[in-house]
Amino acid sequence: MKVAISKLPDSGWWSKGMPKYNDNPAMIESAIPNLKLLNEERTKLKNVILQNGHDVIEFDFPDELDRKEPKHDFIFIRDSFISDQNGTAVILSARQPTRRIENTIVKKYLRSLNMDIIQMPNSPDLKADGGEFYLCKKDNILFSGLKRNSLQGAQFVAEQLKVKSMVLVEGEGFHLDTYFTPALNKRGRIAALIVCLKI
């Protein structure tokens, strides 16, 4: 498996303070992340991926997102798309308007890997963030949250990925990946679900 991650912005991740999104209780306006810790954790993440026999693809952080008004959320690269894990990516349409530029940029990066691209249509009814999905390929099940995904957006993704089942998960987190994750066994099948019941 190939795992795509973003390099950090040259200016340092939110080195002048992060923004606050109304639907994200974890963000503290103007907070500055601990960049030393961030770099250590990022190195550990890469090592774990490599030690488990997977490849790491590092995309350069886009210059156009590291300017006077930085858009550093791009490091959450999975928010912009979802892959069928077989060479096709669905480019999503972020609910947060300021993040939609990320969808456009990641499409260029994925094309450079010769991936087939499916573009979610630009429609007010179709909204989806990658952090709201888990695709369990071996079981052919798509889990979807509905905080930043619209129901129609989730259905569009399920249709494009040709999944057997889609499970809608309601929770308090702003993204499904903040309170829920499937645990897979060595064969890649769902063995357990890890759920945070209270945030």
Positions of the model-derived regions?
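The feature marks the mature, well-folded catalytic cores of soluble enzymes
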Residues: 1-199
